[in-house]
Amino acid sequence: MPKHGKRYREVSKLVSRQELYEPDEAIELLKKTASAKFDETVEVAVKLGVDPRHADQQVRGTVVLPNGTGKTRRVLVFAKGDKAKEAEEAGADFVGAEDLVEKIQGGWLDFDVAIATPDMMGLVGRLGRILGPRGLMPNPKAGTVTMDIARAVKEVKAGKIEFRVDKTAIIHAPIGKASFEASKLKENFQALMDALLRAKPATAKGQYLKSVSLATTMGPGIRVNPLRAVK
């Protein structure tokens, strides 16, 4: 296990490993633990009471964070004709079809989100082995395969994120930067928690939110009382 640096050990003293904090307290404490020389990302980790091995207990979805992520996301759109024009007008960074497929097959991956119109998926499907493992493949469930291209682009630019439970039943999601005001982080946190509740599988039994923690990129985890994580 790697040893943590002096700075990490110092800020860790501020955090009780036993205590379950109120969301407001956790966010205030989190801002005190962020002392790196760059603007650290704030991430939430939620352990869910689901068994991801079962198809009917998969948890995935999207949420538009009201205050954005603090990161400028580069959006690529696979579209032609009027839909390509719509994408450009909505603020997409890259728009194209066969030309973009060839570029990506050549190793170019300088974008954060890919969106496609349904008619383009036959073409985009060739990129499955490249985009799939990186979580970049357009997907109807994530709202990234759609005819409403303008809305999809604008939502991503505004702070839409995708969440998906991993094989250990944990969801990791960014909710902003350490430089955000505490109130804005709280609003983003609440939006994510509400979205997780909406995505609860009907077959999930027992306690759904088993544990919740917050951390900055370089900071210690701060445990949040899961019973208080949702209003």
Curated annotation (Swiss-Prot):
Keywords: Repressor, Ribonucleoprotein, Ribosomal protein, RNA-binding, rRNA-binding, Translation regulation, tRNA-binding. Gene3D superfamilies: 3.30.190.20, 3.40.50.790. The keyword ATP-binding does not apply. One of its GO terms (cellular component) is large ribosomal subunit. One of its GO terms (biological process) is regulation of translation. InterPro entries: Ribosom_uL1_bac-type, Ribosomal_uL1, Ribosomal_uL1-like, Ribosomal_uL1/biogenesis, Ribosomal_uL1_3-a/b-sand, Ribosomal_uL1_CS. The keyword Amino-acid biosynthesis does not apply. GO terms for molecular function: rRNA binding; structural constituent of ribosome; tRNA binding. SUPFAM superfamilies: Ribosomal protein L1. Belongs to the universal ribosomal protein uL1 family. Binds directly to 23S rRNA. The L1 stalk is quite mobile in the ribosome, and is involved in E site tRNA release. Part of the 50S ribosomal subunit. This is Large ribosomal subunit protein uL1. It comes from Moorella thermoacetica (strain ATCC 39073 / JCM 9320). The gene is rplA.
